Amino acid sequence: AAEGITRHTFVGFTEPQDFLLATNREQRGVTLEEVKAVSASVRRSEKLHPLGVLVHAKDVRPFASIRTYRELLFPVRTAQPVPEDALGAAEAVWDSNLRELLTQAHRETTPFYFRLEIKSHMPLDKKSTFARRFSAELERLSGRMLVNAPSDYEIELRLLEKRDGGYACFLKLLTIAHGRFAYRKNAVAASIHPATAAMIVALAEPYLKENAQILDPFCGVGTMLIERDIRVPAREKYGIDIFGEAIRGARENASYAGEKINFINRDYFDFTHAYLFDEIITNMPVRGRKSKEETDTFYGRF
């Protein structure tokens, strides 16, 4: 952590705000239905957005616990379009509702440490130059109310390239407590994102059986099984993986989640059990370094 950084306390907004629950483009309807399940006393409106679900509400926190979105972002409303040059973009972003969003939502008035992320087709070297110039100019314009700290930050500014040129700007607040996936202390390279696992389970919910006996033959760090049990409680849960490090991580994750799951470090094809399972739920291994023939053989055996 950078020395002297003062953490800010999120206290909520005094006025209703727009915020985006970014999610899988093809499954936005699932998240929309979960938004509609939040008390109408909090919600003002909600609608589909190209990146997810756009919500207008007086308190963001009841929505933060929804499991099927990837990120919670606030649209930064600029007075002028955000241009493609770094200095002009910084000026446009500062001439917006950004300062109001930050000061209204936090108790402390100390500087906010930020990181800039640019989603564009710009070459990496030009993107780095843009980020450096943008960040320095935003620091200057804000009188160092905003301080560039890419390795230890509380807020993230996201610039998304628009089809018609320029950028759309979003704000991500790391000051909002997100306990949804706090159990996931361990992951490996092939691990599924927990929000993706939650989305898959939400889509499968009509077919899930309460108190079922479930098997994940390629369980990794246990994310699919944990999310399955959170959505619809199961009776017996078994996770198998040939990768010992993943199984160790899965046991820890399940413990953090308060889940009782039987994890076995073994090749699925060598596994036998005394009774049949009601469900198999898994994130199947991808091809990776295997040849197409090896992958076809693997899936054929499965």
Predicted regions and their residues:
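Short domain-boundary/entry signatures in modular proteins, especially
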Residues: 10-18, 71-80, 111
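Charged, low-complexity, helix/coiled-coil-prone segments
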Residues: 65-84, 135-148, 192, 243-257
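N-terminal auxiliary segments of SAM/dcSAM-dependent transferases
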Residues: 30, 52, 93-165
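Conserved AdoMet
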Residues: 50-107
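Generic hydrophobic, helix-prone segments enriched in Leu/Val/Ile
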Residues: 1-3, 69, 89-93, 102, ...
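Short, flexible coil/linker elements and helix-boundary hinge sites characteristic
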Residues: 4, 79-81, 109, 211
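Class I S-adenosyl-L-methionine-dependent methyltransferase catalytic core
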Residues: 1-62, 121-125, 151-154, 161-302
